Amino acid sequence: IKKQVIVTDEPELIHAEEGIAPDVEIHHRNELDAIQRQLRDISGVTALIYVQTCASEKRRRRKRNAYPDPAERLFINTDICEGCGDCSKQSNCLSVEPVETELGTKRQINQSTCNKDFTCVEGFCPSFVTVHTRDMKRPEKFVGFPTGWPEKPIIPSLENTPSRIMVGGVGGTGVVTLGALLGMAAHLEGKATRVMDMAGLAQKGGTVYSYVQLASDDEQISATKIPAGQCDILIGADAIVAGSKAALSRLRDEAVVIVNEDASPTLSFIESRDWYAPITDLITRLKGRVHHGKLVTLPAARIATQVLGDSIYTNQILLGMA
């Protein structure tokens, strides 16, 4: 091998490792593009190793206090932000989200999903504000809850036919967790259940489905995946996923659909500064597929953040509505 290079976000840790050959170069990830251009001009075999812990894995370890958690957070001052999108281009991060203001579409950082990589601040922008704190302040109170208890819902019987539920959303938001929660709850009640998760190659932000079937006994469930036209309830954690052809094709004519109006940005938002989620078109598409009164939409992410301080509880809000 003519040349070996390690690129990492923590070069000091690689330097401290024993067993690294003396001819192996170690560089910060900021030099990745220059290193790639350098290696392509070398005749022969070269090796480029990129060392960085997955963002989702960092979040898991931080929850278990097994990975350093920087005591700082980044915010974007929307009064200064001009919506140029350079922060998105620098970071390729979907936690940099659009926010509508009186002066047009600006940028904001979703504090519930931010992995504290901080590459967004490398953009040429004075609107970033660094706050040195470990935890966000939780809401002290929430005014607006209705008084009294709602009417007790009528729970359909599972004696003659199973209940088929599809949860659709994006990776990293708890779609699989919600499917597992429903399956375990049914199991604890002594009911038969089948749960199948469809994540495919989805990473954080990719499309994810969880198919949940509940029945009084196992013989009522003939297939693990919900067949086309057989879904009774669709919990749409993301409106873009819920309004897709793949989701709509599973619905029964009498299906009930609960959809979160707060859509997550897609890859197109990074590439196009003027991208916006076509929520109105998606809701119209759902209305055309679902009978009147069977579609419920709500800003679940905003409710979860305002009431509980974190949008990670969005799916539980939708489950409660269902």
Regions found by a protein language model. Give the residues of each.
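Active-site lining segments that contact anionic ligands and/or coordinate catalytic metals
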Residues: S43-V45, A71, S88-Q90, G104-K106, ...
